[in-house]
């Protein structure tokens, strides 16, 4: 235990918390423009063609964002909204594209978990 005089000379320092989503700069979402839309393969033991986009954000950051759901309408120069949330089997992908916002369409014919994919409620 430190003495009072030691603490007066050298006060205790707060631990600096490191964020897992630095490009958001403490915001819930950020807007950006797609610079490249492509597919990539996940780490072992998984196998798929995961859809991702390279995005230049309004704050100048360039990040890789995962495009969830079946099918998408994104191409180069599409304006999208990204949120935090990594994809465990894609190294370097720390952001998700928000479906149904800006130029990103919602997932068509989605019945369950619709709010996560920007899908409207089906007619009866």
Swiss-Prot record:
Protein's UniProt name: Small ribosomal subunit protein uS12
Cellular component GO terms held in the UniProt record: small ribosomal subunit
Record family assignment: Belongs to the universal ribosomal protein uS12 family.
One GO BP: translation
General function of this protein: With S4 and S5 plays an important role in translational accuracy.
Residue ranges of the region described as Disordered: 1-20, 104-124
UniProt entry tagged with the keyword Amino-acid biosynthesis: no
Subunit structure: Part of the 30S ribosomal subunit. Contacts proteins S8 and S17. May interact with IF1 in the 30S initiation complex.
Domain of life of the source: Bacteria
Disulfide bonds: none
Keywords: Methylation, Ribonucleoprotein, Ribosomal protein, RNA-binding, rRNA-binding, tRNA-binding
Basic residues: bias regions: 109-124
Species: Psychromonas ingrahamii (strain DSM 17664 / CCUG 51855 / 37)
Molecular function GO labels: rRNA binding; structural constituent of ribosome; tRNA binding
HAMAP family: Ribosomal_uS12_B
Modified residues (3-methylthioaspartic acid): 89
């Amino acid at each position: 235990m430190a003495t009072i005089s030691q603490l007066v000379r050298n006060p205790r320092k707060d631990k600096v918390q490191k964020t897992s989503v630095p490009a958001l700069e403490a915001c819930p979402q950020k807007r950006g423009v797609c610079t490249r839309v492509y597919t990539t393969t996940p780490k072992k033991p998984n196998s798929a063609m995961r859809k991702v986009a390279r995005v230049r954000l309004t704050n100048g950051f360039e990040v890789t964002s995962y495009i969830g759901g079946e099918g998408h309408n994104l191409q180069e120069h599409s304006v999208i909204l990204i949120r935090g949330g990594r994809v465990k089997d894609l190294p370097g992908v720390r952001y998700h594209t928000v479906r149904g916002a800006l130029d990103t369409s919602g997932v068509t014919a989605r019945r369950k978990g619709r709010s996560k994919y920007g899908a409207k409620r089906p007619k009866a």
